[in-house]
UniProtKB/Swiss-Prot annotation:
Disulfide bonds: none
Protein name, entry field: Large ribosomal subunit protein bL12
GO biological process: translation
Gene Ontology CC entries for this record: cytosolic large ribosomal subunit
Keywords attached to this entry: Ribonucleoprotein, Ribosomal protein
Source species, domain of life: Bacteria
Alphabetized HAMAP family for the sequence: Ribosomal_bL12 (MF_00368)
Molecular function GO terms recorded: mRNA binding; structural constituent of ribosome
Family: Belongs to the bacterial ribosomal protein bL12 family.
Assembly and binders: Homodimer. Part of the ribosomal stalk of the 50S ribosomal subunit. Forms a multimeric L10(L12)X complex, where L10 forms an elongated spine to which 2 to 4 L12 dimers bind in a sequential fashion. Binds GTP-bound translation factors.
Length: 124
């Protein structure tokens, strides 16, 4: 019985980076191949290559406080650990970055928390 490509892809998708590294090494040993990348000339402009890379760091920007400023200030305090006055200054000074250099999950969580409080938020 042959294993379907989809089954293999599903199994690989569930692996950790360490497990994937071990799998690549096993392929190299079993089949006598190398996983070294072949040097290929990149695009002339370089812009397409940058766009193809997936972003790993995000900035959560508060664009507008909305009607419930008190709830937004509380959410900013929770997310940043700022004091009351500092959080109020961030909210009053919108658009302002609330979190910078965070991963996708943290950015989405912060965005949801701020939007639930009534703010308008962008993730860049």
């Amino acid at each position: 019985m042959a294993i379907a490509k989809e089954d293999i892809l599903a199994a690989v998708e569930g692996m950790t980076v360490l497990e994937l590294n071990e799998l690549v090494k096993a392929f190299e040993e079993k089949f006598g191949v190398s996983a070294a990348a072949v040097a290929v000339a990149g695009p002339a402009g370089g812009g397409a290559a940058a766009a193809a890379e997936e972003k790993t760091e995000f900035t959560v920007v508060l664009t507008e406080a909305g009607s419930n400023k008190v709830a937004v200030i509380k959410a900013v305090r929770e997310l940043t650990g700022l004091g009351l006055k500092e959080a109020k200054d961030v909210v009053d000074g919108a658009p302002k970055a609330v979190k910078e250099g965070v991963d996708k999950a943290a950015a989405d969580e912060a965005k949801k928390k701020l939007e639930d409080a009534g703010a308008k938020v962008e993730v860049k």
